[in-house]
Amino acid sequence: MMTDGYSSKISEIEIANLLSLNPDTDSESRASSSNVQAPKPAAVLVPLIYDPPNAKNPGWQILYTRRTDSVQDHKGQVSFPGGRADPGDNYPTGTALREAYEEIGLRPSDVRILGQMPPFLTITNYLVTPVIGVIPWPYNLTIQPNEVSRVFTIPMDWMAKAENYEIKQRKFPPSAQIPPQFQNIQVIYYRQY
């Protein structure tokens, strides 16, 4: 049990202040200049949970979902609740909150939005904006069984420890029809928690 980690010392206000710094818009400019077809807007909710010092895993934790093996895309992958923007969404926050409600039953009124991270372009031509929000915990989630197989949390302190991850270059074979900006990218691989 880690009680002196960084995540147990940073406050909600400090997280919000970090998110409000000038965002990197480089991914948006790459998206507009590198694709024939405009990227599709999407958003994910990055749900943060704060466990008090007397909890089993004190400090900040991130809530993840694991997709079912029956969904059309990204079968069995670990993800955040989210998806493609719908007309009428207050994009990106409204999209992230709507998707979180649909996938895990997280009511939008229960999420305190702290800010958002810069959008990033995916290999499938989505421009995804991560929206950061704090949720009360414990919370009675209602999992959409057609999309989500499970929900779990991982402490941020664990994720920050270098022995828990490695950074590798991801390379695709020349035969893969991959846009140039994805040919040789750095990927963070975490060991099993």
Task: Please identify what each model-predicted range represents.
Residues 154:
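A conserved hydrophobic position in a structured secondary element of the catalytic/binding core
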